[in-house]
C-alpha cells in the first residue's frame, strides 16, 4: 500500500492519479471497501481530508455479521484481541435492579452476536490490512473540492493540507465521508429524517473505575445514563444533556464530577480520555447511487447509537457494494449491477434506523406517557415469557432480507392495506415505532396481520447463509467461509453440484470464479469416490448444514460473495440457476460451449478523456 500525505513536485500541483475506484473517507466503511477491492486486484485510491486516522473511540458495538466481513478479508484474527465477545446489554432501574437483559447466545454466522470493541484499533487493523496491496493507496491530508462525472468515469479535484492540488480520475467513486458528506451534498441527494431533541455527553475513561462487564442502560427518569465496559480497561459513560445545559458547562470539573459520582465513588481519580456531546439523528438518503458515484456508511444513513448499528450498517454496505464494484471494475459485469446496491441495502438501513429509535424510546422516553408505556411494556415480561424471550434473544432485530436485486425470486409483491398505512402515519410516536418495527418481520403474527401472508416468508433466498464449523478434506475444523473461500459458491447437500452441468453454465461459473462444494455428513468425508475433480468436499461436523437443508425441498444453494443466498434449486436445475444468476449480475456474455478463462486480477478498464456532464462543488 502507498500512503501519501503530500509530495513536493510543483509549487501548486501534485501528480494526477489514475485509479479504478476512488473512495472518499478513510473511516471504517471506506477502509473496508478498499480491503474488499484490494483482494480482488482492483486499483483503489482512498482520499482522506485529515492527516491521520481518527484516534478516539466512537462506536463500541460490533455484531456477528460485521465480524464475518472482517473474516472474509482475512483480518478477523487481528481484530479479535480488541473485542469482548458476548457483550450483553442490561436495562436497569434507578436503584440498579436489572429488569431486562439482551443476551443472544446463538452463533448462526460463526461469531458472537454482540461484541464490544475499540473502534480506533479496528480502524487501524483495516488500514494496516491495506499494506498487502501495492495497487491500493491512501492519500491523507487531501480534501475534496469538486468532482465531475461522465459516461466513462469520475474526476475528483482535491487539495492537500499544504494547499497543493491534484486530480484523481476513477471509473467509480464511493462517498464514505460521514454524516456531513460533501459527496452527498454535492449530488443534492435528499437526506430526510429527524433529529432527536436531547443531546448526550459521552465520556471515555482509562483504567476502568467500575470493572463490571457488559453494558448497562440506567433508566433514571431524572437523567438516563449508560455505563459500558470496553476492551483494554476502557469504560464509556453517556449522560443525557438536560434542557438548558451546554457541553462547556457539563465539562467543568465540578459538574463532570457530579455526573460521574452516579457511578464512581471517587470521581477525582478518574483517568479521562475525552468528553464530547452528541446529537442523535435518524436520516436516510433517498438513493445510494447517482450514476458513477455511490454513497456508503454514514453518508447514506445515520441512526441513534442505542443498538450499535450505525457502524455495523456501514460494514453491511461495504459487504454488499464491494464485490459488485469489483465485478464491474474488472469488466465481469454490467454497470447496472450497481443499481442493486440501493435496492438491497436501503430498506434494511431504514429498518435499523427504526430499531435504533425504538431502543432509544425504551431507554429514554421523551414524555411521561412514554415512561409509563415503557414501564408497562417491561412489566409484561413477568407474565408473558414469550415477549421476554423475543426481547432477550434479539428476535426483534430486523435481519437483511433481499426481495429484489441479485436474487432468484419472482418480483416482490408490495402488500399492506389500511393497517400498514396507519402504522406508517404513527411512526413519529414511540408505540407506533415499536409496532412498526415488530411488523417488519413479515413472518411474525403482527407482520402477517399488517401485510398479509408472505408466500416467501420461509424462503432462505435473499438472507445470509449460516456459517457452521465444517471438516475439510485434510481433517481440519474450520468455519465454512474459510473452508470454501470467498467468491460465489454452489453447495450441494449429498450431491455433486457439477453433475450434468452444461458447457455454457460451466463457462459462466468459471468466469465468475464460482466454486462448487459437496457437503455431506462428517463420517462420510473419508470416502472420496463421490467427489470429482474441482469440487470441494466438506464434512458437516455440527449437523447444522443437514438441519438447514432439511427445511427445504431443494438440496443445492447458490451463494454470493457476501454470503447471501442468491438462490436454491434441485441438482438437475443447477445449470439453469447459474444462467439466471449470470443474467441478474449483468455478466458479459460467454458464447455457448466456449472455453472460459478466468480474467486477470490486474485487468483495468480503459478511461476515455474527461467530458464533463455533471459538476458538483464542495
UniProtKB/Swiss-Prot annotation:
Keywords assigned by UniProt, alphabetized: Aromatic hydrocarbons catabolism, FAD, Flavoprotein, NAD, Oxidoreductase
Cofactor(s) required for function per UniProt: FAD
Named in its record, the pathway it takes part in is: Aromatic compound metabolism; 3-phenylpropanoate degradation
Q: Which GO terms describe its biological process?
A: 3-(3-hydroxy)phenylpropionate catabolic process; 3-phenylpropionate catabolic process
What InterPro entries does this protein's entry cite? 3-HPP/3HCI_hydroxylase, FAD-bd, FAD/NAD-bd_sf, PheA/TfdB_FAD_monoxygenase
Where does the chain bind FAD? 20-49, 288-298
* Protein's name according to its UniProt entry: 3-(3-hydroxy-phenyl)propionate/3-hydroxycinnamic acid hydroxylase
Its lineage reads: Bacteria, Pseudomonadati, Pseudomonadota, Betaproteobacteria, Burkholderiales
Amino acid at each position: 500500500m502507498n500512503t501519501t500525505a503530500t509530495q513536493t513536485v510543483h509549487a501548486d500541483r501534485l501528480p494526477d492519479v489514475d485509479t479504478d475506484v476512488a473512495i472518499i473517507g478513510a473511516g471504517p466503511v471506506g477502509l473496508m471497501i478498499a480491503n474488499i477491492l484490494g483482494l480482488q486486484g482492483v486499483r483503489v485510491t482512498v482520499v482522506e481530508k485529515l492527516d491521520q486516522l481518527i484516534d478516539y473511540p466512537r462506536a463500541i458495538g460490533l455484531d456477528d455479521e460485521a465480524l464475518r466481513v472482517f473474516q472474509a478479508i482475512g483480518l478477523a484474527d487481528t481484530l479479535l484481541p480488541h473485542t469482548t465477545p458476548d457483550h450483553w446489554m442490561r436495562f436497569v432501574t434507578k436503584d440498579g435492579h436489572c429488569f431486562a437483559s439482551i443476551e443472544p447466545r446463538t452463533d448462526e454466522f460463526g461469531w458472537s452476536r454482540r461484541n464490544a470493541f475499540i473502534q480506533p484499533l479496528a480502524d487501524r487493523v483495516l488500514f494496516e490490512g491495506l499494506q498487502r496491496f501495492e495497487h491500493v493507496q491512501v492519500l491523507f491530508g487531501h480534501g475534496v473540492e469538486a468532482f465531475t462525472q461522465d459516461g466513462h468515469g469520475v474526476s475528483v479535484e482535491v487539495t492537500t493540507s499544504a494547499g497543493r492540488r491534484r486530480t484523481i480520475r476513477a471509473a467509480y467513486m464511493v462517498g464514505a465521508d460521514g454524516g456531513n458528506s460533501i459527496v452527498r451534498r454535492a449530488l443534492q441527494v435528499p437526506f430526510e429524517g429527524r433529529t432527536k431533541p436531547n443531546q448526550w455527553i459521552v465520556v471515555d475513561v482509562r483504567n476502568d473505575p467500575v470493572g463490571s462487564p457488559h453494558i448497562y442502560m440506567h433508566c433514571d427518569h431524572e437523567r438516563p445514563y449508560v455505563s459500558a465496559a470496553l476492551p483494554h480497561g476502557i469504560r464509556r459513560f453517556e449522560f443525557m444533556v438536560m434542557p438548558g445545559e451546554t457541553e462547556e458547562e457539563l465539562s467543568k470539573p465540578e459538574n463532570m464530577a457530579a455526573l460521574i459520582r452516579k457511578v464512581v465513588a471517587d470521581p477525582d481519580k478518574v483517568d479521562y480520555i475525552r468528553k464530547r456531546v452528541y446529537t442523535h439523528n435518524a436520516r436516510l438518503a433517498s438513493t445510494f447511487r447517482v450514476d458513477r458515484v455511490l454513497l456508503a456508511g454514514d453518508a447514506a444513513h445515520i441512526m441513534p447509537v442505542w443498538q450499535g448499528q450505525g457502524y455495523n450498517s456501514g460494514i453491511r454496505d461495504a459487504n454488499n457494494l464491494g464485490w459488485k464494484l469489483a465485478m464491474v471494475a474488472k469488466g465481469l459485469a454490467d454497470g447496472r449491477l450497481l443499481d442493486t446496491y440501493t435496492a438491497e441495502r436501503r430498506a434494511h438501513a431504514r429498518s435499523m434506523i427504526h430499531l435504533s429509535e425504538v431502543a432509544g424510546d425504551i431507554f429514554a422516553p421523551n414524555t411521561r406517557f412514554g415512561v409509563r408505556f415503557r414501564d408497562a411494556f417491561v412489566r409484561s415480561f413477568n407474565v408473558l415469557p414469550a415477549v421476554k424471550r423475543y426481547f432477550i434473544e434479539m428476535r426483534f432485530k430486523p435481519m437483511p432480507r433481499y426481495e429484489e436485486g441479485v436474487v432468484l425470486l419472482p418480483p416482490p409483491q408490495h402488500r399492506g392495506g389500511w393497517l400498514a398505512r396507519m402504522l406508517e402515519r404513527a411512526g413519529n410516536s414511540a408505540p407506533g415505532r415499536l409496532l412498526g418495527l415488530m411488523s417488519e418481520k413479515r413472518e411474525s403474527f403482527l407482520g402477517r396481520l399488517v401485510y398479509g401472508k408472505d408466500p416467501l416468508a420461509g424462503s432462505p433466498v435473499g438472507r445470509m447463509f449460516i456459517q457452521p464449523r465444517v471438516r475439510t478434506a485434510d481433517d481440519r475444523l474450520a468455519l465454512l467461509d474459510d473452508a470454501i473461500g470467498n467468491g460465489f459458491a454452489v453447495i450441494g447437500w449429498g450431491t455433486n453440484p457439477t453433475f450434468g452441468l452444461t458447457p455454457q453454465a460451466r463457462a459462466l461459473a468459471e468466469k465468475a470464479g464460482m466454486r462448487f462444494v459437496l457437503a455431506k455428513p462428517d463420517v462420510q468425508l473419508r470416502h472420496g469416490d463421490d467427489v470429482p475433480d474441482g469440487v470441494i468436499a466438506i464434512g458437516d461436523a455440527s449437523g447444522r448444514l443437514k438441519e438447514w437443508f432439511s427445511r427445504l425441498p431443494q438440496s443445492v444453494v447458490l451463494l454470493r460473495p457476501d454470503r447471501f443466498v442468491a438462490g436454491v434449486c434441485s441438482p438437475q436445475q443447477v445449470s439453469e440457476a447459474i444462467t439466471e444468476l449470470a443474467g441478474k449480475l449483468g455478466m458479459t456474455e460467454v458464447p455457448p460451449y466456449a472455453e472460459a478463462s478466468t480474467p486477470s486480477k490486474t485487468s483495468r478498464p480503459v478511461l476515455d478523456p474527461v467530458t464533463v456532464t455533471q459538476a458538483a462543488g464542495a
